[in-house]
Regions:
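ATP-binding N-terminal substructure of ATP-dependent carboxylate-amine bond-forming enzymes
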Residues: 1-78
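Active-site flanking residues adjacent to catalytic metal/cofactor-binding acidic residues
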Residues: 4, 127, 165, 232, ...
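Short, charged, surface-exposed secondary-structure boundary motifs
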Residues: 12-13, 31-35, 81-82, 87-93, ...
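Short glycine-/acidic-enriched loop or helix-start segments at secondary-structure transitions
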Residues: 13, 59-62, 136-138, 174, ...
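Glycine-rich phosphate-binding loop signature in dinucleotide/nucleotide-binding domains
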Residues: 40-46, 120-121, 157-158, 240
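ATP-dependent carboxylate activation and anion-phosphoryl transfer catalytic cores
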Residues: 44, 209-329
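Active-site nucleotide/adenylate-binding loops and adjacent lid/helix of ATP-dependent enzymes
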Residues: 86-169, 180-184, 211
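Phosphate-binding site of ATP-dependent enzymes
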Residues: 144-224, 235-245
Length: 329
């Protein structure tokens, strides 16, 4: 297993979990990042890529749709949903319309920010980029004054990029959903986020089962054409009435996918099976489980020495390091 991160190995504890580690360039520099991946796959004879962040997925999505001939030079499979499914997932506006028209679940209709300049509306509202990630650019508008301020500070182009929706109060519900199109299997495991960071990562959750919500997720995954593991988010407006409003589908692992593993279902293994033709394990998690995340400190000094001793230069200025036999975390 070859791992990549934008930071040096000695800064990243998980660099100990892979056989070889490379420091990658920022994916926002798309051409440089594409060249990095091509060189890396060739050097390490990697036959599979598994992108884990939205910005990486956006690069690969453009690569395989707009630069198809160059993408073939990668000579590796990308274990990700098909381009059409990813395109829909990465556009919150199109996804909401897609689900609403098919009546698959409750959605929150919205309008572009530019349209609100001449409209009267009720508050509070939520404004967010239609292709945003990790709550970046998210704004809560409590009044007309908040709206006027946002309109004043946004360019005309930015006004077209913002989607504005009514704000619905409630817990954020995250559902890990894995679909194997060949076997027809779809497994879903929801969790209620009790504490979360400002960029939307849950730190204390309650894993639970809900037949109605899980069926909605199965219907969505099938309609969109999902393959592998994705993460769907909802607002739980009323727990007793099973009132859930769809927020988005991230076409990747959730940052909190380990919560599903802790509850008893290995989503990473299930994702791999969706691309290797194997059947998924049955999901046997029952009841409620409260699971909290904590951080621990690790000394990386021994890894520093290994990194220096094993450091090599690649054509894309990455560093690689063989994993020591005694490395552990």
């Amino acid at each position: 297993v070859v791992g990549c991160d934008i930071y040096p190995a000695e800064w990243v504890v998980n660099s100990r979990d892979v056989d070889v580690f490379y420091r990658a360039p920022y994916a926002t520099g798309r051409e440089q990042y594409r060249n990095f991946l091509k060189e890396l796959c060739k050097k390490e004879q990697a036959s599979v890529l598994m992108p884990l962040t939205d910005v990486e997925i956006d690069v690969i999505q453009q690569w395989r749709t707009e630069l198809a001939e160059d993408f073939k030079m990668l000579d590796a499979e990308v274990w990700l949903s098909d381009a059409s499914a990813v395109s829909l997932c990465r556009n919150k506006e199109k996804m909401e319309v897609f689900l609403r028209e098919r009546k698959l679940c409750r959605t929150i209709p919205g309008v572009r920010l530019a349209e609100l300049e001449t409209m009267s509306c009720s508050y509070p509202l939520v404004a967010k980029p239609f292709d945003g990630r990790s709550s970046q650019g998210l704004r809560i508008l409590e009044s007309r004054e908040d709206l006027e301020f946002l309109l004043h500070t946004c360019s005309e182009e930015q006004k077209q990029q913002y989607l504005v929706q009514p704000k619905i109060d409630g817990h954020v519900i995250t559902v890990d959903v894995v679909r194997n199109p060949e076997t027809g299997q779809i497994s879903c495991l929801p969790r209620r986020e009790l504490l979360r960071t400002l960029n939307g990562a849950g730190t204390s959750v309650c894993v639970f089962r809900n037949g109605l919500l899980e069926q909605q997720c199965r219907d969505i995954a099938k309609a969109v054409g999902i393959r592998g593991c994705v993460n769907m988010e909802f607002i739980e407006a009323d727990q007793e009435k099973n009132e859930y409003y769809f927020l988005e589908c991230n076409p990747r692992f959730a940052g909190g996918v380990a919560f599903s593993g802790a509850a008893g279902y290995d989503m990473a293994d299930a994702h791999i099976r969706c691309f290797t033709g194997e059947k998924l394990d049955e999901l046997s998690v029952t009841g409620e489980q409260y699971i909290a995340r904590r951080y621990a400190e690790y000394s990386m000094n021994s890894q520093d020495k290994a990194a220096v001793a094993g450091q090599t230069d690649s054509p894309c200025n990455a560093t690689s390091q063989a994993k020591g036999e005694n490395d552990r975390c």
